[in-house]
Amino acid sequence: MTGTQALRHHDNFLQVAKSYYQLTKPRIIPLLLITTAAAMEIASKGQVSPLLLFLTLLGGTLAAAAAQTLNCIYDRDIDHTMLRTRARPIPSGRVQPLHALIFALVLASLSLALFVFFVNTLSGFLAMTGIAFYMLIYTHLLKRHSIQNIVIGGAAGSIPPLVGWAAVTGDLGWIPWILFAIIFLWTPPHFWALALMIKDDYAEVDIPMMPVVKGEEATSEQIWLYTLIVVPFTFLLIYPLAACGVVYGVAALVLGFVFLKKAWRLKQNPFDRDIARSLFKYSILYMMLLCTAMVIDSLPMTSHLIATIASLFSCS
C-alpha cells in the first residue's frame, strides 16, 4: 500500500500504523508471553538472564504477531461477513491482503533471525513451527471443517513454553511438555466458553464450533470434563516432576477450585451467556495467575523465605 492509497482510509500515517498493529490482535499476545516467561523461570530456577528473557519475549511477540496477521488474511472472507469483525483492517479495506502478507513475512523473518542469532536455533525452530501449525493445521485444515478445531489447533497456542524452555536450556524435557499439555487441556474450556458467547456469529459463517454443531448442553459438558482434567494435571509440576513447590501448589489449588466451580455452574446453566462470559474471563485470569505463581515459586528468594519459615516452626 503506497502512502496515497493508505491515506484513502486513514487521516495520517499514525492511523496506518494503528491498522497494522490491529492486524496482530495484540490482546492475545500477553497470555502467550507469560507462559513463555514461566517456562524460562522454571528452567533457570528463577535466575534467567534479563537480556535473554527480553530477547525471547520479543521474538515470541514477533512470531505471534506474524501468525495473527496471517490468520487475518486467511479469514478475511468470514471477517467481512460477521458484524463483530467487519471493522478489522483487511475487511474494512484499510489494509490490502498483499501488504498484510508482506508485513507478516517481515515479522516472521525478524523473529526467526532474532532467535537464531541471539537465542538459539531450537527456540527459533519451535517459534516457526507454532506459526506453521496455527496456519496450516488450525486455520486451513480444521477451523472450517472439524468440530475438534480448537482442540487439536490448541497445540499452536501451547508451543510458547517449549520456546521459553528451549531458550534457556537448548533442549526439551518432561517439564516443558507438561507445561505444553496444561495449556493444551486448558484451551477447550477457554475457547468454548467464548464460542458459547458468540455462537450466532460462528453459525452465520458456517464455522463448526462445538456450540454450533452439538449445542450448548453438550459444549458445557465438554467444558466441565476438560476442566476436570486440566486442574489436577497442573499438580504434576509438583509431583512427580518437582518443578514447582508450595507457592505454586497453593495457587494451583485455589485457582483450580474456582475454575471447577465456574465450569460446574455453566454445566448447570448451559444457555446462560453471562455465566459463559464469566468463565471465559476467569480462564484468562486463571492461566495468567497460575503462570505468575510458577515464576514466584521459582525465585531463589521464595525458597529461602519458605526455608526460613519452616526452620522457625521446627525450632518452636
From Swiss-Prot:
Catalysed reaction equations from the record: heme b + (2E,6E)-farnesyl diphosphate + H2O = Fe(II)-heme o + diphosphate
EC annotation from Swiss-Prot or TrEMBL: 2.5.1.141
Principal subcellular localization: membrane
Topology term for the membrane: Multi-pass membrane protein
Ranges annotated as spanning the membrane: 28-48, 50-70, 99-119, 122-142, 150-170, 178-198, 223-243, 244-264, 293-313
InterPro entries: Protohaem_IX_farnesylTrfase, UbiA_prenyltransferase, UbiA_prenylTrfase_CS, UbiA_sf
Disulfide bonds: none
Its job: Converts heme B (protoheme IX) to heme O by substitution of the vinyl group on carbon 2 of heme B porphyrin ring with a hydroxyethyl farnesyl side group.
Protein name (Swiss-Prot/TrEMBL): Protoheme IX farnesyltransferase
Organism annotation: Microcystis aeruginosa (strain NIES-843 / IAM M-2473)
